[in-house]
Amino acid sequence: MNKIILLLLLIAFISCSDNNENISGNTGLFNQTTFFDGLSRDYILYVPSSYDENENTPIVFNLHGGSGTAEEQMNYVSDMRNLSDSEKFILIYPQASSDSNGIPIWNLGGVNSKATDVDDVGYISHLIDKISEFYSVDRDRIYVTGFSNGGYLSFELACKLSSEIAAFASVAGHMFIDTYNDCSPTHPTPFLSINGTEDNYDGIAGYYLPIDNSNNYWIEYNKTDLVPEIIEIDDANTTDGSSVQYYSWKNGTNGVEIDHYKVLGGDHSWPSLNTNSDKGKSNGDIDSNRIIWEFFSRFDINGLR
């Protein structure tokens, strides 16, 4: 009987353990599992070949949309691996837990959440600490971006994990009303948004704010210029049915700024120079991945670098 109990305990211990043995400072692509808050959570880790253990390295979290997966986000929506190689940052694609209907979705808390018993803010914080155990991480340069529901969580993290998040970006995402009501950032926070004017998810009453209101929160909080610089982006792809305007509110506290790319005629999608996307009518005039990284790279937790 004692042997059976011991065996069961051993099985339970193994099932609750992280599979860290294959990372431990190594470079490459890793499908990982970690145990947090009573749940087994998956994520994809990409460490560039340019990683140097003697240098502190930034982290970029890239969050998939509702009903999506980490693998889909990496392979079909926002593959940042080439950027990670050339720009020397660690890339993490976390996987959301599933709601009662089996749909992967990030928990934003509040009365409108579909997964109220899951602590996704704590999960991202856990991943920061976990990866920092095995790699030389620049804790002043932790960035987060996401698509749709992943964009919503990026707002949540900027509000509730502010001490860790240096800057954030949202694509086809908005600020959840509960996030807005409970937001308590602790430092000036640079923010970039990319949204289509034909996105049917923009500002659904009772759930989340229109993107203009979401931007305005951070414009006011960061004390930037109230009048933006506006630039018409070259309509390089004339067959995608859309064009882009760039807005930038500059001169915020500690040099931070708020940038917004308005995709005229664009809908719920992640703009890319490769417009073969299954995520809406994708604009082909801008490279969202590069735009986001170049924005992030200018800032750390203290503001403009």
What are these regions, as identified by a protein language model?
Residues 4-13:
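Sec-dependent N-terminal signal peptides
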Residues 16-59, 72, 83-86, 116, ...:
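A domain-start/cap signature at the N-terminus of enzymes
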Residues 34-44, 54-143, 153-156, 160, ...:
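Serine-hydrolase catalytic machinery in alpha/beta-hydrolase-like enzymes
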Residues 61-63, 171, 263:
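Alpha/beta-hydrolase
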Residues 174-190:
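Flexible "cap/lid" loop of the alpha/beta hydrolase fold
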Residues 186-191, 254-258:
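Short, proline-enriched alpha-helix->beta-strand connector loops that line the catalytic pocket
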Residues 193-195:
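Short beta-strand/loop motif that positions the catalytic acidic residue
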Residues 198-202, 268-269:
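Acidic catalytic loop of the alpha/beta-hydrolase fold
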